[in-house]
Amino acid sequence: MSRVFSRLHPQLAESLEEKGWQPTPVQEHVLPDVMAGHDRLIIAPTGSGKTMAGILPLFHRCLTESWPSMSILYITPLRALNRDVDRRLTELAEAVGLRVDVRHGDTSQSQRAKQTRNPPNLLVTTPETFQLMFSGKNLRAMLSSVKAVVVDEVHDLAASERGWQLGVGL
């Protein structure tokens, strides 16, 4: 097992080893800092492991620090990216007893109600849906337990109206 993965929560490290995953250079560089609770802006090429570089240490902290449900918010600019991130993270999350779910404009009312009753550990959403979450009392209460936020493709949001709206929400 790699040195950096061996520092992760035992369940997480074991799951990664079972899957045969090896850390990318980006992950080797970023994981120790984020595991220690430092904020980081991760800029690297597509396919370099940025998503897992940001998520693995947060899953580690979620497990080691017993974070409550709805402790990680993952914001992406596109619904299609939401679904991709949800698919990629769900398998790993389930292997260590965590839950991931997605919420955006296409999420059914029944699924939204389920998320409100039983929030996931990590919620993947869009900036617009994140803003709408402030309008409901139960949803605002859910947001109060958020300990970490990941904004994917921040460069696509930064120079637009969506970016400043997201900034206000955060």
Residue ranges, per PLM feature:
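Conserved ASCE P-loop NTPase core motifs with emphasis on AAA+ ATPases
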Residues: 1-14
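Conserved P-loop/Walker A NTP-binding site and adjacent catalytic elements of P-loop NTPases
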Residues: 13-15, 19-170
